[in-house]
Amino acid sequence: MKYEIQGEPMPVVICDLESGEPMITEKGSMVWMSPNMEMETSAGGLGKAFGRMFSGESIFQNIYTPRGGPGMIAFASTFPGSIRAVQIDPSHPIVVQKSAFLASEAGVELSVFFQKKIGGGFFGGEGFIMQKLSGHGTAFLEIDGHAVEYNLAPGQSIVVDTGNLAMMDATCSLEVRAVKGVKNMIFGGEGIFNTVVTGPGRVVLQTMPLTAFAGAIASMLPYKQ
């Protein structure tokens, strides 16, 4: 596969494929393709389908394969931001926000990732259930807003508002913690829970998660009873 990412802040990734070379994507990500692309919808097995449903994703995934020669297919972001290509291999799985996966080569496997410490997880918003990408191949991630990357040393931590965590290496650990102090919770305006990511590993943060954008817009709309 060869690919090119174009057009921030509303990006698209255009993939050129060899005949018979499949790609997988979530429902609704394809925006254009060559006529010889064949689509097949698959749940990928009961366990994987249940996991995607539990994480809030579509049960089904679409598999696109060029037939009779090379093909082309394009996948677009659903929100202003960027598309990031990440290389996955068996020794380098990653964990991503459940809405971040856009498309990948067929060798990439998706599964549900749970925090080991779930004390505040049920209330921590988007960070409780995430997706793990493993296997082998290139995956394309959808980043809301601008992407900022940090490389954490072993034991080094960063505190993140939960929705702003877009991706981390699977070597990192994740914990949702309540904000200290009742006054801070009530009057701080920063939410009740934060996510603490601890290295070693890479962390990619996003500056404008969709939930924050939707909340800002909703606060400006006239209230109707």
List each model region and its residues.
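Composition-driven recognition of glycine/serine/threonine/acidic- and proline-rich low-complexity segments
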Residues: 1-225
